[in-house]
Every structure is written in structure tokens, then in C-alpha cells.
Amino acid sequence: MRIDILSIFPEMFGPLNQSIVGKAQDKGILELHTHDFRENATNKQRHVDDMPYGGGQGMLLMPQPIFDTMDKIPQKPEKPARVILLDPAGKKFDQKMAEELSQEEQLIFICGHYEGYDERIKTLVTDEISLGDFVLTGGEVAATVMVDAVVRLIPGVLGKVASHEDDSFSSGLLEYPQYTRPEDFRGMKVPEVLMSGHHENIRKWRLKESLRKTLERRPDLLDKYEPNEEELKMLQLLRENVQDVVE
């Protein structure tokens, strides 16, 4: 995969050269490029923003520097890149979207600053995406998060496919609790079932705990989750237990 990031602060993406994303680059699985679109500004002061027509607060990113930067980024004519505009008004980013984007050959992220974008910039864009229902100073932090979430899903980046398939949200549920050595730490013991070696009992425990955590912390996820018969029975028991505690 090739990822291009347009930003006036390209130095903010240094962390993407470390850890999993850095290793993906070392393996040749990922090609990551940052582009300072200020370098393509044609005015003497190299401004990339200006006042909005019609008045209003703040400054808007001008189209020219971004268009000219995009013109210099190589793309395959037969399979153009997905071009993502980081915008708080965009569609909210989630695990399903990360999985979808990980299937692409090329992604381009445009990071905004100031009050917003000149509307004409959006003619370059295939997707407008938001990290969440809040406003950041710029799009760089959001782009970093999204790149990390996407790259780890590319085949060959993580050691085993199961490494990310068991992650929270990958199955539609939150991940079950996990433990490592020692068996007993300051009186806190590892659940016996996990040391039993009984794979079916371990599977059932993990599923139940995953459902329990989701029910307690993110019940909204269950609204769009389609449980099987086994999961329905577990959820019913968990809800009954919660009701007993309330009463």
C-alpha cells in the first residue's frame, strides 16, 4: 500500500516511522510519503489560507496549494487513490471503515487547519472522515490514528491474522479480559478456566466476558450486532444478573 499525507506540519508524522507502521515500511509492505503543501503556494508570503468570501470568523485553506500538491502525487489511472479529507463534519471513523480502507492500494489524507476548507477542495475527495464528535486543532492527529488503524490490518503487517481478528470491535464486540504471568499478583489471581487447558471452556468464558464487557461499557454496539443462539442465551443470563443487582 502507498499512503500520502498532505499537511503543513509533516514533522508531526514522525511516530509513523516507529513500531508496527515503521516495520511495515521496513518490510516493503507500506510506502509512506508526507507532502508539505505550503511548498506549493504561489503567493510571495507562501500563505495557504485566506479570509472567507461573505465574511465570517477564521481563515480557510486555499485550493491552489492543495490542488498543485495533488497534481504531483503519482496515482494509477486504472485505480485512483481513495482521497480522504479529515473533517469534523465527515463520517465517523470506526473499525469497519479501517478494514475497508486496508483493502485499498493507495490512500491520500488531506489534513486541514484553521477554520476549514475552500469548498472546491472537496472536488478532489472521495471520502470526508471524522475521528469523532469533537474538534481538533488540525487533521494531523486524526490522520495518524487512522493510518495506524488501517496499516495494522494489511496482510503481512502483524505476525498472525488472529492478532487483529480478536481485537475489540473486529468482531463487533469488545475484547475479553486477558492475563499473563504471574498466576497470582498481589492477591489478584488469573481465572482458573484459563489455566485448565480445556479449549471449549476457555472459548465459552472468553465469549461470555466479551459479551459482558460490551453490555456494561458499550451497549450501543449490541444494537447492530447479530448474536447467534449461544450468544443470545449468554446475553439473556447477563441481563438477568444485571437486573437482579439493580433490584
UniProtKB/Swiss-Prot annotation:
Predominant localisation class: cytoplasm
Keyword Flavoprotein: no
Keywords: Cytoplasm, Methyltransferase, S-adenosyl-L-methionine, Transferase, tRNA processing
Subcellular location: Cytoplasm
Highest taxon of the lineage: Bacteria
Family of this protein: Belongs to the RNA methyltransferase TrmD family.
GO cellular component terms listed in the entry, alphabetical order: cytosol
Gene Ontology biological process: tRNA N1-guanine methylation
Binding of S-adenosyl-L-methionine, residues: 112, 131-136
Gene Ontology molecular function terms on file: tRNA (guanine(37)-N1)-methyltransferase activity
Gene name in the database record: trmD
Species of the source: Lactococcus lactis subsp. lactis (strain IL1403)
Protein name as annotated: tRNA (guanine-N(1)-)-methyltransferase
Subunit note: Homodimer.
